[in-house]
Regions:
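Divalent-metal (Mg2+/Mn2+/Ca2+)-assisted nucleotide/phosphate chemistry catalytic cores
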Residues: 99-171
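A generic, well-ordered mixed alpha/beta core segment in the N-terminal half of proteins
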Residues: 55-128
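Active-site SXXK
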Residues: 29-47
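Phosphate-handling active-site elements
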Residues: 46-54
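Generic secondary-structure signature for well-ordered alpha-helical cores
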Residues: 12-15, 46-47, 79-83, 131, ...
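Conserved small/polar residues in nucleotide/adenosyl-binding loops
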Residues: 175-177
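A short acidic/small-residue loop/turn micro-motif
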Residues: 22-26
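A short, well-structured edge-of-sheet supersecondary motif
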Residues: 1-19
Length: 177
């Protein structure tokens, strides 16, 4: 197994102190952006309104393996807002966990959105969209209010302007910054 990457160490002012590879190469944050994306859920009041637990917030902030306990957390998040997995637009997937995948295959179950490693993040975005009274079918759209809020948060956390963000759409239908 081979991995490729770059290392950049910078001080608080952004001065490069050490690097391995090109320190100015554009890199998409992908799942590393999930904690920043979850800030929108926290700021929306959805945590309090729907009684979201720390465990449920944690699955919104990270990728998961699609194991039964993780899938149950995502189902609970959705259920607290009166939603179900049909609202998720993260794409269908088998679990990353080989054991969970084998069990689904043994039972003849197809891949589904709950087992997608990003379903927790998507559940959080749905809660944010719902509490703001937004169209739940549009939450992953780049120009949706949910995504605009997230972009503002990322700019604030990273100390950059919107014009400095780069966007792409991946196989999960959601933009990554």
């Amino acid at each position: 197994l081979e991995h490729h990457g770059r290392i950049v160490v910078a001080d608080a002012a952004g001065n490069v102190l050490y690097h391995y590879g090109d320190p100015y190469a554009i890199t998409f944050a992908r799942s590393a952006a999930k904690p920043m994306q979850a800030i929108a859920v926290c700021e929306s009041g959805a945590l309090e309104a729907y009684g979201v637990t720390e465990q449920e917030l944690a699955v919104m902030c990270a990728s998961h393996n699609g194991e039964p306990a993780q899938v149950a957390l995502v189902e609970r998040i959705l259920g607290k807002a009166g939603l179900d997995s049909s609202y998720l637009q993260c794409g269908d997937a088998y679990p990353i966990s080989e054991e969970s995948k084998r069990e689904m295959l043994r039972r003849g179950l197809p891949p589904d959105a709950l087992h997608c490693d990003c379903s927790g993040k998507h559940a959080g975005m749905l809660l944010t969209a719902k509490i703001h009274g937004e169209d739940l079918t549009q939450y992953p759209a780049p120009d949706s209010p949910t995504q605009q809020r997230i972009n503002e948060i990322i700019c604030h956390v990273c100390g950059c302007g919107m014009e400095e963000l780069f966007f792409a759409v991946d196989g999960l239908s959601l933009i990554h910054i």
